[in-house]
Design a protein with these regions (language model features):
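Domain-level signal for Mg2+-assisted phosphodiester chemistry and nucleotide/NA-binding surfaces
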Residues: 1-106, 152
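Nuclease catalytic cores that cleave nucleic-acid phosphodiester bonds
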Residues: 82, 86-193
């Protein structure tokens, strides 16, 4: 019998959907709706760690009246939510909202939801390590508290637009390139649509 069994590390993955969307778009990744988010999470967790939670945060579009742009965005979000919540992806989707101001949409409430969930997870000992895919520096106070509680936080960003504030405050940093994420682009789904 093994006298020193090594405990499997528990990992929770938190994705800032809007932040990731624009980073993938910058890299010319196609068909972002059907990107293999679950496989990306699996790769980031790596061997010897167990994913205990996968959360995807996004501002929800509310189409009002004859707003055709909002209606089209809403239809795209429904497809995205269905994909994320499918058995193969297994994400818990957390919604903020989008506010339209002067014709431009602004996401509201998402960073607060991420910060609260990170902190609740740390306080309730739900994970050993949080993997955060976001470049939002508003999350730094939550990150600092998580570290103070003895948890690890891995910042996953992109080499073309890293967040130096998150790099400085995270326990570990991984900056992805287009080559790192190309394998998660769902080309087959793109051909069907």
């Amino acid at each position: 019998m093994d006298k020193n069994p090594q405990k499997t590390k528990r990992v929770a993955v938190y994705i800032d959907g809007s932040n990731l969307y624009y980073k993938l778009k910058d890299l010319d990744i196609k068909n972002i709706t059907y990107f293999w988010y679950g496989n990306l999470a699996k790769q980031l967790a790596g061997e010897g760690r167990t994913i205990v939670a996968k959360r995807y945060y996004i501002g929800s579009v509310r189409a009002k009246g004859g707003d055709k742009k909002a209606k089209k965005m809403q239809e795209g979000q429904v497809r995205l939510f269905n994909h994320l919540q499918s058995k193969s992806e297994g994400f818990n989707v957390q919604r903020g909202y989008l506010m339209k101001n002067d014709g431009t949409y602004h996401e509201k409430g998402v960073d607060v939801k991420i910060a609260v969930d990170l902190l609740v997870g740390a306080y309730e000992n739900m994970y050993d390590t949080a993997i955060l895919i976001s470049s939002d520096t508003d999350l730094i106070p939550a990150i600092q508290k998580i570290k103070h509680l003895g948890k690890e936080i891995e910042y996953v960003g992109f080499s073309h637009k890293p967040s130096y504030g998150l790099i400085k405050n995270a326990t570990e940093t991984r900056l992805l390139t287009k080559n790192d994420i190309k394998e998660f682009e769902n080309i087959e789904k793109e051909k069907k649509n």
